[in-house]
Amino acid sequence: MADAVDPVNKRRQFLKFLAASPLMASAGLTGGLVDELIASGPGGAPDLELFMNEVGKQEIAIASEAEALNVFDFQVVAKQVLPPAHYGYMATSIDDDSMLRINREGFDRFGLRMRRLVDIRSIDSSIELFGKHWSTPITIQPTSSNAAFHPDAEIAVARAARNKNHIQMLSTVASSAIEDVTAARGEPIWYQLYADSYWNRTLAMVKRAEATGTPVLVWTIDLLGGRNTETATRLQRIDDRNCSVCHEPTATSRYSRSVKPMGQNLPDPIGESLSRGLTWDFIARLKDATPMKLILKGVVTREDALLAV
């Protein structure tokens, strides 16, 4: 008759086997931590669930983009290779980064309703939007200052968007000029607008985008009152590099838009400063100024969505 199997002992042996692997060593699960996890269950029984949770928390840097399993694998590398201020600029959210966590938690609540026994040999994820056919509904959002992360900046993003036929939005504070990005994309892109405090300067940016054939203007409306980016500010403080070559410090902001392509050669301010006084009336002004389609970026309430229709 076979001896009875001791599940506690078998589980302990299994965890020790895992802990001895190179993967666990690179993740930092060695020595005393492993011993603690092995003896952490009730009555000294190893807690497998706790062990695997600890494994999942470890940040293991990938050696190449081919090793990435999801986009968050690149964040681990970014922490290691980017200057502190550059990493903080990309990783920061508002205040204590609570909105970043809230957004992630919100998306985690979404699920897919999978239908079974469907022929998946030919899947069509394409959409029609503003009269144009796109391969997927994926939109590359307007992250700014891409030269802080790659020398090709938004030009590289445009090439990727062209290869996959994705919509690309270009930020007002992009490192690359809209004319160059449009050429790299091979067709007009969408333009994300930060309205200037003066209408004549805003109009100049709108007309410049229009001249490249841009079909859609995306006005960001959730940044009119400024923002408090604590993570970015903290990491800027510990970055001791001389950043004056790329950034122009001002009295109110560390970085001025004037050093960005879309902020250069703007006309001198004329008339009243709009500053924080922009309201829904400004939408009509934009629509009257350009034939481009207008999207409002930053709407979060049902009431504002109804006003935007």
PLM regions: where:
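Alpha/beta enzyme core
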Residues: 206-309
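Conserved, mostly hydrophobic/aromatic
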Residues: 83, 140, 161, 219, ...
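An N-cap/entry alpha-helix motif that binds or orients negatively charged groups
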Residues: 44-131, 238-278
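Glycine-rich active-site/cofactor-binding loop and its immediate structural neighborhood
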Residues: 135-171
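N-terminal secretory signal peptides and thylakoid transit peptides that target proteins
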Residues: 2-22
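Active-site-adjacent beta->alpha loops and helix N-cap segments on the catalytic face
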Residues: 170-185, 199-204, 226-233, 277-283
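Hydrophobic faces of well-ordered beta-strands that scaffold small-molecule active sites
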Residues: 138-141, 168-170, 189-191, 217, ...
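Glycine- and other small-residue-rich loops at beta-strand/loop junctions that grip anionic moieties
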Residues: 92, 146, 150, 170-171, ...
